[in-house]
Amino acid sequence: MNEFTHFNEQGRAKMVDISEKEASVRTAAAVSSVSMNREVHEKIKNREIGKGDVLAVAQVAGIMAAKQTSAIIPMCHPIALKGVDIAFCWEKKEQKSILHIQSNVKTKGSTGVEMEALTSASVCALTVYDMCKAADKGMVIGPTFLLEKTGGKNGDYKREKADVDMED
C-alpha cells in the first residue's frame, strides 16, 4: 500500500508538491445515481418539474462542480480542465426508476482528475435531488464511485464490474 502523502513530518496536513511531475493527459470517469419513484421519473422526462429542466440544470451544476473541486476538497490542486462531459441514463427496477449519472473529466497536467469527476457526478445527483425533493423526499443518492482513470505515474485504473451500462 502507498504511504499517505498529504502529511508532513509533524503529521500535519499538507498539499503535495507536484511541481516536478511531468504534465500528461489524464482522464477520469465517475458514476453516481439517484433512485426515485416512477412518477418523478415521468415528470423529469416530460419536463414537468416546477424548477425547470432537471437534467439540463444538473449537467451545468456538474460541470461547475468539476471546475470548483479544489475550492471544496482541501488537498486538491486547482486544475485547468480541458473537458467535462456528463451523460445520463435511466434504469427501471420494480417500483423505482434509477437515474445513472456518469461524469468524464479530462486535463493535461501534473495531477489526476479523479476528484473532479467524483465531485461532478455527486453534485449532479445532489442537484437532481434538490430540484425534485418536493415531489419525492424518499429519493436515494448513490452509490458514487470512480469508474476509471488514465494517466499519471500510478497508471490506469478500471473498475472490474460497473453494474451500469451508460450506453443505454
Curated annotation (Swiss-Prot):
Keywords: Lyase, Molybdenum cofactor biosynthesis. Substrate binds at M75, C76, H77, M115, E116. It comes from the Bacteria. It holds the Pfam family MoaC. It catalyses: (8S)-3',8-cyclo-7,8-dihydroguanosine 5'-triphosphate = cyclic pyranopterin phosphate + diphosphate. The keyword Lyase applies. The active site is at D130. GO terms for biological process: Mo-molybdopterin cofactor biosynthetic process. InterPro entries: MoaC, MoaC_bact/euk, MoaC_sf, MoCo_biosynth_MoaA/MoaC, Mopterin_CF_biosynth-C_dom. GO terms for molecular function: cyclic pyranopterin monophosphate synthase activity. Pathway: Cofactor biosynthesis; molybdopterin biosynthesis. Its EC number is 4.6.1.17. Homohexamer; trimer of dimers. PANTHER family: CYCLIC PYRANOPTERIN MONOPHOSPHATE SYNTHASE, MOLYBDOPTERIN COFACTOR SYNTHESIS PROTEIN A. Catalyzes the conversion of (8S)-3',8-cyclo-7,8-dihydroguanosine 5'-triphosphate to cyclic pyranopterin monophosphate (cPMP). Belongs to the MoaC family. This is Cyclic pyranopterin monophosphate synthase. It comes from Bacillus licheniformis (strain ATCC 14580 / DSM 13 / JCM 2505 / CCUG 7422 / NBRC 12200 / NCIMB 9375 / NCTC 10341 / NRRL NRS-1264 / Gibson 46).
